[in-house]
Amino acid sequence: MMGAPIPSAAPVGAATPGKGLLLSIVVPVFNEAEVLDLFLARLEPALEKARAALGPGGRSEIVFVDDGSVDGTAERIAGLIRPGAGVRLVKLSRNFGKDAALAAGLAHASGDAVVPMDADLQDPPELLERMVAAWRDG
């Protein structure tokens, strides 16, 4: 029906009972092994601030989607995965393109809010805190 309001899955700021809000960063990657260290060096402090902006118990996860890399990108990311690290890897069987990789990442993200981000730093991680604050403000 046209003009009918679209129901929201959950109001902004609604956390899982007993846990704080979860921010998912979805990062499609293709042959990004050379930039991963720089990306993570900038992302980690930005995520710390973004988690604080989420409010008490704010949490984050990074969902990398390897789009058929042949330069060791997936192996490098796999080395970051450990219990409690908040890093996940979705590995596509071949290069399907950025749109497909992003869609796969969105499907695997668990966050109350999801931010797509490129590993080549086209999207400055330092903006995450402001983005989260704007989202929280509605």
Where are the model-predicted features located?
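Structured catalytic core of nucleotide-sugar glycosyltransferases
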Residues: 2-138
